[in-house]
Regions:
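Carbohydrate-active catalytic/glycan-binding domains of CAZyme proteins
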Residues: 8-319
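Bacterial N-terminal signal peptides
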Residues: 1-4
Length: 319
């Protein structure tokens, strides 16, 4: 049985704070929904918490907005990564996220135990939730670790989930698509690979022989169209130990590509896993996190906003 939202918050001793500056929040993979109905911005990401703001400057949170059934594959308390909210015009708010059940091992590759991890869609009738599972028990193959699912409606009018096949199992991360049911309650057919980590001209790592090669990580896809109608995809990998974001463009204007990678990263070093949204004044924004180490060697991830220009043939960040 699912535990009520208020009960969960009380059990975990959550304290909601107000008037918190954006750069005081610690959050990976920040995704922002600008909700026209409430005239509020809602920020999700890794950790399963929600923040909200009227002006993108001062925020209220964190608030837990998800509920889970203990008998689902995710379990009662899954790890939650890279949550993002989408609207399709049907009145519902859809919560695309990556869920991990650490109690279930699906594979062992090169000595690494692969936990049960997959992208899934939850739904609520309010941006504040509670978001619950509403459709098929699974959206993606149970024998594969998948992550960072996002939503896109392609030129064929069909909805799709674009997601990553995790490098921990395939050692050459993939970017893939799968068709969603019209009401997003499940998937149709099999996934299709759009491109692989090895297609990147800018990512870097050292292989087992000490040779410099492409990095095997694919992370954080997000789809957009430019003012000229060109289809682009933001995605993230690494340049050695620096989190780095690139962009690819589809030559066909559809998810099927072929996808051509831009030769250089699109954001400064240390920024990645972004998405795009429009402010209420119409300005396009990029929500991204900065990935760095503090004085004690601990990883710190801080949300950051860039203004972007989509009016031309390419996405341009206003630095």
């Amino acid at each position: 049985m699912a535990i009520g939202l208020t009960t969960v918050s009380a059990q975990r001793g959550m304290r909601v704070k107000k008037n918190v500056p954006l750069d005081s929040i610690r959050l990976s993979d920040p995704a922002i929904l600008a909700d026209q109905k409430t005239k509020m911005y809602y920020m999700t990401g890794t950790g399963g918490m929600m923040w909200r703001s009227a002006d993108l400057k001062l925020w209220e949170g964190p608030m837990r907005v998800t509920e889970f059934e203990a008998d689902s594959w995710m379990g009662a308390r899954p790890m939650i990564w890279a949550a993002e909210l989408h609207q399709t015009g049907d009145g519902w708010y859809y919560y695309f996220a990556t869920f991990t059940n650490q109690a279930v091992i699906i594979d062992t590759v090169r000595g690494n135990a692969i936990e049960r991890r997959a992208s899934q869609v939850l739904r609520a009738d309010s941006p504040m939730g509670p978001y619950r599972a509403f459709g098929d028990a699974t959206y993606l193959p149970a024998n594969r670790p998948t992550l960072d699912g996002t939503y896109w409606k392609d030129k064929d009018g069909k909805p799709y989930m674009v997601f990553c096949g995790e490098w921990l199992q395939n050692w050459n991360g993939t970017m893939e698509k799968i068709e969603l049911k019209p009401d997003l309650s499940g998937t149709i057919g099999e996934p299709k690979v759009l491109f692989r980590a090895s297609d990147s001209p800018w990512s870097r790592e050292k292989n087992d022989k000490g040779e410099i090669t492409w990095n095997k990580v694919t992370d954080g896809p997000y789809l957009f169209r430019t003012g000229t109608g060109r289809l682009g995809m933001l995605w993230t990998s690494w340049v050695f130990d620096v989190y780095t974001q690139g962009v690819a463009y589809s030559e066909s204007g559809t998810l099927d590509g072929p996808w051509v990678q831009e030769p250089e990263p699109i954001t400064p070093p240390g920024y990645g896993h972004s998405m795009l949204f429009q402010r209420f004044d119409g300005q396009w924004m990029m929500s991204v996190h900065h990935h760095s180490k503090d004085d004690h060697g601990r990883t710190v991830r801080i949300p950051h906003l860039f203004e972007v220009d989509l009016s031309g043939d390419k996405l341009i960040i206003k630095l």
